[in-house]
């Protein structure tokens, strides 16, 4: 059940990313977390890698309450850094998301 739930969530997040409802970083953090709950094939492990790499590259950026407490100027600076990092991964993230919307649900 956990494997199936994680796979369905990955599919939903990948779809939301392709529809631009999430940033690459937000999708990467969520997919990287969920990928640890999936019994993955070799091919799926390769698809998850780019999401894990982007999540690690942006892990220092505060989220949720920690983000809310930042000064406006700090948020702007971190957003610029995030978009610069995302640009390096974007092509691979988009291609990975395209693959993950078809992830096997069994």
Language-model segments: what does each one mean?
Residues 1-106:
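Acidic, Ser/Pro/Thr-rich low-complexity regulatory regions
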């Amino acid at each position: 059940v956990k494997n199936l739930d994680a796979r369905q969530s990955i599919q939903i997040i990948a779809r939301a990313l392709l529809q631009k409802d999430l940033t690459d970083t937000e999708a990467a953090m969520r997919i990287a977390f969920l990928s640890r709950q999936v019994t993955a094939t070799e091919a799926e492990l390769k698809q998850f890698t780019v999401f894990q790499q982007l999540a690690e590259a942006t892990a220092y950026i505060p989220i949720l309450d920690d983000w809310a407490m930042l000064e406006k100027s700090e948020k702007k600076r971190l957003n610029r850094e995030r978009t610069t990092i995302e640009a390096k991964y974007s092509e691979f993230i988009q291609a990975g998301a395209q693959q993950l919307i078809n992830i096997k649900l069994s």
